[in-house]
Regions:
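Binuclear metal-dependent phosphoesterase catalytic core
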Residues: 1-51, 55-58, 98-106, 111-130
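Long, compositionally biased intrinsically disordered regions
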Residues: 24, 70-75
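Conserved aromatic beta-strand anchor motif in extracellular beta-sandwich/beta-rich domains
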Residues: 59-63
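Surface-exposed loop/edge segments in extracytoplasmic proteins
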Residues: 64-70, 123-125
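Aromatic sugar-binding surface patches on proteins
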Residues: 76-102
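Extracellular interdomain linker/stem segments of modular secreted and single-pass surface proteins
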Residues: 133-135
Length: 135
């Protein structure tokens, strides 16, 4: 997303985060439902834009912890949709990024939650994806 890096320095300690324009500080990732990424049609996808190897990206299926999501290189689904609607120049073509994560829920799963923790231990609000409506 459109934004900028913020660095906070206290004495000899430094922390940083990415601040997305129009969003609160704790908006650090976006979740895409199954079927959004055509190469991974059964997976729920998380885009964690300021991710590095010290971050944790975990998922829960119907409240049960399932562990770490699997990182993969991919293209931004939002940008692919945007570019697909327009005739674009070569310089606007999508670029592969390294900050995508996938989890494949069971067929009977009703809800997936994703939790992200940054390198400084900040836990960002869980995001949910409803897979099956309540009966």
């Amino acid at each position: 997303p459109n934004g900028y890096d913020v660095f906070e320095i206290t004495g000899s300690e430094i922390e940083w985060f990415y601040k997305s324009v129009g969003h609160e500080r704790n908006w650090q990732f976006k979740v895409f439902p199954r079927g959004t990424v055509k190469e991974k049609p059964n997976s729920v996808i998380a885009k964690v834009w300021n991710w590095d190897k010290k971050w944790q990206v975990k998922w829960y299926e119907d409240g049960a912890a399932k562990g770490a999501m699997q990182r993969f290189n991919g293209y931004d689904p939002d940008y692919l949709e945007y570019v697909g609607r327009l005739k674009t120049e070569k310089y606007t073509q999508p670029q592969e990024s390294f900050f995508y994560f996938e989890a494949t829920p069971s067929e009977k799963a009703r809800e997936i939650e994703i939790e992200v923790t940054d390198r400084f231990g900040h836990i960002f609000p869980r995001q949910k994806v409803v897979l099956l409506p309540d009966k």
